[in-house]
Amino acid sequence: MRKVNPKVIFTLTAGRTGSAWLADFLAQNYQATSIHEPLGIEDFGVRMPDIKVMRSFNNYGNNNTVQEFWERKLSLIQQNSYIETNHTLGKCGLIENLYQTPFAADTKIIILKRNIVKQCSSYIVRNDFVHITTAWQWYLHPSYQKKLVNHTPFLKFDGVGLALWYCYEMAARQAFYKLAYSSSIKMIEVSLEDIVTPKGANRLWQALGQFGTCTLPPRKNENQIQAPKSLVQHLKKITSSIQFDADEVAQQALNDGFSFENVSAAA
């Protein structure tokens, strides 16, 4: 199988969306190192954003704290290719700090989505939105100043509202980045449900500029505890009642002048 050098690949995704599996898929087919999340003690603040970076970006925007993190991280990308599917990066300035660098022309961003009911139920059974520090490090929180989706309508969904808000916020951010930056960085939009099939995986492989067929690694990082059927039905009922168009939300934000590059001062 002929392979083209992947150059630089990152993802824009929410987490619990198949990013670990995607890292294995890319490693297996490129026969190259593919990082999911660098979690060594010394990685935080250098290769992996810490809570300060995550909170700074989502409260104040792309400020000095965030930019200094990205200067450190991007300075480590020196080899011919670099692949990382870490979902936290897109929530703390990946696009803003990449699109004007020499890497941008050779970078591909995989916008990875998942069925919203499966995605949301995964967060809930793991209690991902019970402790605020988990949301600070890995996800987002509605208390942040910079957000695209109003969280107030989700408050009535007791027990699932935070996780649901996060799903819609990330869908809006994916649409926002695609609208605002896809002319500067190549973006490839896929769903987990599609790329774990042979046909879908091959479509992704070809979208990455590759030739021939690819192979699929086994499933990875799946929840050990299955979501109760009652939870799944509850989420299906809620999501079917919500009128939401991520592209419309993103376009309105752009029309209103929203940008994470507009930095606000700390209180």
Model-predicted segments: where are they?
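Hydrophobic/aromatic beta-strand patches that form the interior of the parallel beta-sheet core
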Residues: I9, T33, K108-I110, I188-V190
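PAPS-dependent sulfotransferase catalytic core
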Residues: M1-I77, R219-A227
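PAPS-dependent sulfotransferases, especially Golgi type II membrane carbohydrate sulfotransferases
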Residues: M1-N5, K147-A163, Y168-A171, A175-E189, ...
